[in-house]
Amino acid sequence: MKHLKNYLFALGCLAAAGLTSCLSDSDSDENTGISRQEISQCLAATKGNYTGKIMFEVENSNDSNDHIDTLDIAWSVTTDTMVVINQFPQAAFLENIKDSTMKAALAAAEPAESKIMINFYQASPIVFLLYPFPIIYDIEYKGEPHKASLVFWYNTYYSFGQFDTSSRVFQMQLIMAALFLDEDTNRNYLLNSGSNTASLPIMITNANLSKNQ
């Protein structure tokens, strides 16, 4: 899998084009934004259960041009305008943790639930912004129980998705920002860098990826 950037570029172009639309609270034709009725129609079209792939960047010692790995993943869109991923895999970010003790603790932990709020802002094609909540992992770190929180960028058009009503292809991009231990937000375990934030993209899709290889 070598073409994550191609996917992200295509999605980014669509998101940028849709930013001219704004949410509105009225059904008036004079509004340039998406109406409540259109939001309901978008939700009705997208809700349901999905299976596909999560795509994320990794190092590949065998091929310097191939930095993408994939895992199977399942998610659902609920009636309360949420994306729910019951088991978000730690493998999507483990390679970016340089603290070996933290990496081992997360590798041994159970996958955790991810909840992401959807904000529809374009009806045709269906495009939406994503507001992911932190994913909380129960871990044992240095012999003690802790909670590790995976935090994402939100309120940005880099966290978004699209849905094709004819093919039912669902695609979304999220940007991982930080991994914190308990309430300590002064140390970001992602990348183990001096910066307190990272920008690590992942993509989730049920598209046929073999067509893009």
Regions found by a protein language model. Name each.
Residues 1-6, 12-46, 210-213:
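Bacterial Sec-dependent N-terminal signal peptides
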Residues 34-213:
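First exposed extracellular module after export/assembly in secreted or surface-exposed proteins
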